[in-house]
Amino acid sequence: PMALSFRKSVLSAERYESAGVFDVNGDGIPDIVSGGYWYEGPDFKRQHKIGGVTAHDEYYDDFSTIAMDINGDGRLDFVTGGWWGETLRWRENTGVADQDWPMHDIAKTGSIESTRAWDVDGDGDLEIVPNTPGKPLVVYKLIRDANGKGTGKFTTHKLKFSGRENDHQGHGLGFGDITGNGRGDFVLTNGWLEAPENPYEGEWIWHPDFNLGRAPSVPILVVDLNGDGKNELILGEGHGYGLTWWEHNLDATGKRIWTSHAIDPYSSQ
């Protein structure tokens, strides 16, 4: 078999909190987007301005870069937000070279550890889900017109929990099918939420089956690692050391048993 090799390329001296890969200029070639700039593919040597990003000490307030055509103009914009700004936002791709991309607020959310995009309601479109420790779990759904194009507006859906004293998140968030019924369930720090038939109106059933630690990663991956038809969990320690996977089994009574296995206990974040 052919051996793999990798070559490191330094794109810029700037540092930001996140990066995304998507076609900014519509030429069919993926570009790299990070913070205040995007880098034109395929060699990523040409740097283009996006606009300023608020800095807080050594951090920037851009803890995600999620590509989505939010206003339906055919150009990919992106969703971002951060810890200190406590606001979920999107930046508008104007299509004009080196013109600042306008920033639009989606919602005041509380401090955002990171944001993910998952198809929560199974309609084939991605929803936006920020991980906001100490705050409720809320899904933001892009409003689309009759042609399926984004309108630049979102609806807000605060999920209802059943069997839990509060509806707060911790540090760490995952999404995937735990039960095998085809619906996506949410994985939190110390348990998981079983999806109802209607994710926005029904109650999500709380299962305190495990404790993933103080600050598991965003995302927590939900995937069948051992080929037994049940999804396992993969997570890293967000502010410490360790990469682990959690094996998912059922005992004779049908109770779910989760067993932690170390992948790499020595690496950080």
Regions found by a protein language model. Give the residues of each.
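Beta-propeller-forming repeat regions
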Residues: 1-269
